[in-house]
Amino acid sequence: MNARRRLWSVLMLILAVGTAATLTIMALRHNLTYLYMPSEVLRGDTAQQTHFRLGGIVEKGSFQRTSGTLNTRFIVTDGNARLQVRYARILPDLFREGQAIVATGQMQHGTFIAENILARHNETYTPRQLANKMQPTPTQHTHLDTPIAETTP
C-alpha cells in the first residue's frame, strides 16, 4: 500500500508540473512581442504576428502632424524599405527625424498603427535588438562577383 501511495504522489506531482509548464509556455507565447524591421514587415515575415514591434530610423522630412490633434504620421526605414506609421498619442520628448525608434502596434491596410513609441535617449545609443537587425547586409554588385557589405547613412 505504501508503494501505491508513493506512485500516486509521483504521478500527481508530474501532472502538476506538466500543467504548470504548459500554462507558463502558453502565457509567454501569447505575450511575446517580436521586433521586425520595415523590410521584414513588407516581405511578409510578420504573417503569424498581429501585434509586434517595429524598429528603424524616422526618415528625415517625413514627419506630419494633424493640426489641433495628437495624430502624427511619419516614415520608418531600415535603409532597405520604408513603412508609414501612424500614432495618436503624445510623442516622447526625444523623438526626432533621423533617430532610431521602436514602435509597438499592428498593421492595418499597409500602415503600421503604433500604440507605443520608444525613442533612443542619446545620439550614441541604439537598442541592442535594433542595432543587431540594422547591421550592414552583403549586397551583390554587377561588376563584382563577391558580396560587399554596404552601410547606409
Curated annotation (Swiss-Prot):
Q: Which cysteines are joined by disulfide bonds?
A: none
Annotated stretches, region: Disordered: 131-153
State the Gene Ontology BP annotations.
cytochrome complex assembly
Show the InterPro entries listed in the entry.
Answer: CcmE, CcmE-like_sf, NA-bd_OB-fold
Q: Which UniProt keywords apply?
A: Cell inner membrane, Cell membrane, Cytochrome c-type biogenesis, Heme, Iron, Membrane, Metal-binding, Signal-anchor, Transmembrane, Transmembrane helix
Q: Does the keyword Iron apply?
A: yes
Localization terms from the record: Cell inner membrane
Indicate, by first and last residue, each region the UniProt record lists as having compositional bias (Polar residues): 131-141
- Carries keyword Transmembrane helix? yes
Q: Which residues lie on this side of the membrane: Periplasmic?
A: 28-153
Mapped to this chain, the residue ranges on the Cytoplasmic side of the membrane are: 1-6
Bilayer topology reads: Single-pass type II membrane protein
Give me the residues that bind heme, please.
Answer: H121, Y125
The entry's function note states: Heme chaperone required for the biogenesis of c-type cytochromes. Transiently binds heme delivered by CcmC and transfers the heme to apo-cytochromes in a process facilitated by CcmF and CcmH.
* Identification of the protein by name: Cytochrome c-type biogenesis protein CcmE
